[in-house]
Regions:
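Conserved alpha/beta core surface patches that mediate binding of polyanionic ligands
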Residues: 57-79, 176-193, 198, 347-349
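Conserved P-loop NTPase
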Residues: 478-537
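A short beta-strand-to-loop transition that corresponds to the Sensor-1 phosphate-sensing loop
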Residues: 241, 437-441, 464-467
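P-loop NTPase motor domains
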Residues: 20, 120, 134-194, 245-253, ...
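A short helix-turn-beta junction within AAA+ P-loop NTPase domains corresponding to the substrate/partner-engaging
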Residues: 253-257, 449-463
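A generic structural motif
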Residues: 93-103, 212-214, 371-373, 408
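Extended, folded cores of ATP/NTP-driven motor/assembly subunits in large transport
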Residues: 1-164
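Glycine-rich phosphate-binding loop of nucleotide-binding enzymes
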Residues: 177-260
Length: 582
């Protein structure tokens, strides 16, 4: 692709068999006459005057190219007569428009250079420029007499039947408001813009494959930030390694550090809504999972005891719908001892036996799972199943994005894998898109349900991988539907810069094109770890409060943007004050 715009016009004037035969015959005769130059004619006259026989050296006086072209014209006449191909007048014109004549001349010369490098000939029109332009317009068959006669076989090779995929101008999901804009406009090579959407029709499930250090976290953060452009959008992110922490704090999201072991760590009350019949059914299923994790086989008798105990505590005040109350109502030593680790005083009581739930109702929520995933399944599974359930409760038809980083770890687990599979199959109808990110195709290949995952994610984003063409990796990429050219693109792409997206609508290599201000909130600063950055920003938040983003921008050398942030923040406060006064 070329880094400027132009219009490429292709004009075909088809000819009938008899009309084409006349033009081919004329061309053949012209080439036949050109086969002998002046020297050949003189040599022939001398030979005739001496009545001598032709000599082998006489062939040297002939124009071999003209003779070959005459033979080629004869073959064209045979093909035309047989009807195996048709012949047409064909004209290619590339129209360059620019208010600056110098710029237009430069662009035209660059296009001609690119054509010559590809083995084509061309010229920049001068006297014939007007006719060439008119001939490029629909319905103008006569202007521009530069129209060589070629066969349909050649035309099939020359016609630009493919083009760079520009993406869809609007979000294609029918559940979104009409004419919703694309998710973002990434940077690309050439002049053709690219409009990026997660959705393929009304399915927004997306698979992201990228090795560590290739730019996956920045991409996920950018997608989460951009998704909030849609009215009433909800974003839920399951993060690993605090890569979304800075964005969450700056964007006003609620960030939960699960099982961090701090005094202010997040605590849940899974049984708080037992006054609802649907919640009681879910609670029984959830408690059965807890019992199974503790080695208790759930029978119909045990299920009946659980249901009875849940009915008893459902009438309590919300603050008393806890696991501690449940163990008291069970009146069964085996069941009580199995649930006691999750109650107050147990190993996991600080997470799952609160008198009130710390989980809020914000529209942008980030769950940091680094510490939780380091714990035993006996605690990680109940917590994540509860979070999944709460997210499902929030699905009200609003545009919803659910991002799961390091998704292969969740997919490898039978319970999580089954739940995510269910999401992939059903959440489309609730206007929710699931983005699954993992490090490599080899991790995906280990999943027993990989075909369901791949088939349910019509949009796939591949990050650079210099080993993509190795035998071990190539077969995995081919299983995902990539061809040689696409694997080569992924192999040659630059880490932390390029992303290759493929869907049923098209494919494109793109860049996020982020400036230093955006990267201040989406990426870890060079030379610092995420942990160091987080500690520093926590200190800024404690010292400056809501003004910390401006201070952070000033530290990064973006004073003008810091002033703009403060002006915008003050304007919002003034508007809120006016609303309160009114």
């Amino acid at each position: 692709t070329l880094p400027f715009g132009f219009r490429w016009s292709n004009r075909l004037i088809p000819l009938g068999t008899h009309e084409a035969a006349k033009h081919i015959r004329r061309q053949q005769l012209q080439w036949f006459k050109k086969r002998k130059g002046a020297g050949a004619w003189v040599q022939e006259m001398v030979s005739k005057s001496n009545a001598s026989q032709p000599k082998p050296d006489d062939e040297l006086w002939l124009d071999q190219d003209a003779r070959a072209m005459a033979v080629d014209a004869g073959e064209a006449a045979s093909e035309n007569a047989s009807g195996s191909v048709r012949f047409c007048f064909y004209t290619q014109v590339m129209v360059v428009m620019d208010p600056d004549p110098v710029r237009a001349s430069y662009v035209a010369s660059e296009i001609l250079k690119a054509l010559n490098d590809a083995g084509f000939t061309g010229r920049i029109e001068t006297v014939n420029a007007l006719d060439a332009y008119l001939g490029s317009l629909p319905g103008h068959g006569y202007p521009n007499l530069r129209r060589p006669l070629i066969s349909t076989r050649n035309i099939a090779d020359l016609l630009p039947v493919t083009s760079v995929w520009p993406g869809l101008a609007n979000n294609p999901c029918s559940f979104f408001p009409p004419k919703s804009p694309p998710l973002m406009w990434p940077a690309t090579d050439g002049a053709t813009p690219f409009r990026f959407n997660l959705h393929d029709s009304d399915v927004g499930h997306t698979l992201v494959l990228g090795r560590t250090g290739s730019g996956k976290s920045v991409l996920l953060a950018m997608i989460a930030a951009q998704f909030r452009r849609y009215p009433d959008a909800q974003v839920f992110v399951f993060d690993v390694g605090y890569s979304m922490w800075t964005l969450a704090k700056a964007a006003g999201a609620t960030h939960y550090d699960l099982a961090a072991g701090r005094p202010d760590s997040l605590r849940f009350q899974p049984l708080a809504q037992l006054d609802r019949p649907s919640e009681r059914a879910w609670a029984v299923e959830w408690l059965e999972t807890l019992l199974a994790l503790q080695g208790v086989s759930v029978t119909s008798v045990i299920r009946a005891k659980l249901e009875r105990a849940i009915e008893l505590i459902a009438v309590n005040d919300p603050a008393h719908r806890t696991l501690t109350e449940l163990t008291a109502q069970l009146q069964n030593a085996t069941l009580s001892s199995a649930i006691r680790p999750y109650a107050v005083g147990g190993n996991y009581g600080q997470l799952l036996d609160a008198a009130s739930d710390d989980l809020q109702e914000g529209r942008f929520q980030v769950f940091e799972m680094k510490h939780l995933l380091a714990l035993d399944d006996k605690v990680a599974v109940p917590v994540l199943l509860y979070l999944f359930h709460r997210i499902e409760q929030r699905l009200d038809g609003s545009p919803t994005l659910i991002e799961i980083d390091e998704a292969w770890m969740a997919l490898m687990h039978s319970l999580f894998g089954a739940r995510i599979n269910q999401w992939l199959l059903t959440l489309r109808k609730q206007n929710a898109a699931v983005v699954l990110a993992t490090q490599s195709p080899s991790q995906l290949a280990q999943l027993s349900n990989r075909h369901t995952v791949v088939d349910s994610c019509p949009t796939r984003i591949y990050l650079p991988n210099p080993d993509a063409a190795t035998p071990a990796q190539e077969s995995l990429y081919r299983d995902l539907g990539l061809n040689d050219r696409e694997i080569s693109i992924i192999q040659g792409a630059t880490a932390k810069r390029h992303y290759y997206v493929k869907s049923s609508a098209g494919s494109r290599l793109f860049e996020l094109g982020l400036g230093p201000v955006a990267l201040s909130f989406l990426a870890t600063p060079s030379g610092s770890s995420m942990e160091e950055t987080r500690r520093h920003l926590e200190a800024l938040i404690a010292l400056h409060g809501d003004d910390w983003p401006a201070v952070w921008l000033e530290e990064r050398g973006h004073a003008a943007w810091a002033r703009q942030f403060r002006q915008h923040h003050k304007s919002r406060e003034d508007i809120q004050d006016e609303i309160q006064v009114a």
